[in-house]
Amino acid sequence: MSLNAETKAAIVAEYAQCENDTGSPEVQVALLTASINHLQGHFANHKHDHHSRRGLLRMVSSRRKLLDYLKGKNSTRYQDLIKRLGLRR
């Protein structure tokens, strides 16, 4: 259910603040968003997969916390990120 290395590298390259940046909130949120979108496709066919649903809810919660952190630190970066990812908020 995880993303492959090429997809992760592409996401990191797109959202990184500088070279080799994998820890910034933008990169972490983008990776979590890609994983969440991947799992949502999984649930279209596997409606009763409750174990994976719990993992999905943990990812959503983690993404929410990172977005709240980023909003508190730098609201312009937060607004730019949710616009780029197409998230509601």
Curated annotation (Swiss-Prot):
User: Which keywords label this protein?
Assistant: Ribonucleoprotein, Ribosomal protein, RNA-binding, rRNA-binding
What SMART domains does the record point to?
Answer: Ribosomal_S15 (SM01387)
Q: Name one GO cellular component term.
A: cytosolic small ribosomal subunit
Q: Name one GO molecular function term.
A: structural constituent of ribosome
What's a GO biological-process term for it?
translation
Q: Gene3D superfamilies annotated for this entry? A: 6.10.250.3130, S15/NS1, RNA-binding
Coiled-coil ranges per UniProt: none
Pfam name, any one: Ribosomal_S15
Q: Which InterPro entries match?
A: Ribosomal_uS15, Ribosomal_uS15_bac-type, uS15_NS1_RNA-bd_sf
Q: What does this protein do?
A: One of the primary rRNA binding proteins, it binds directly to 16S rRNA where it helps nucleate assembly of the platform of the 30S subunit by binding and bridging several RNA helices of the 16S rRNA.
Q: Which HAMAP family match?
A: Ribosomal_uS15_B
Q: Which family does the similarity line name?
A: Belongs to the universal ribosomal protein uS15 family.
Quaternary structure? Part of the 30S ribosomal subunit. Forms a bridge to the 50S subunit in the 70S ribosome, contacting the 23S rRNA.
* Name of the molecule in the record: Small ribosomal subunit protein uS15
This protein's encoding gene? rpsO
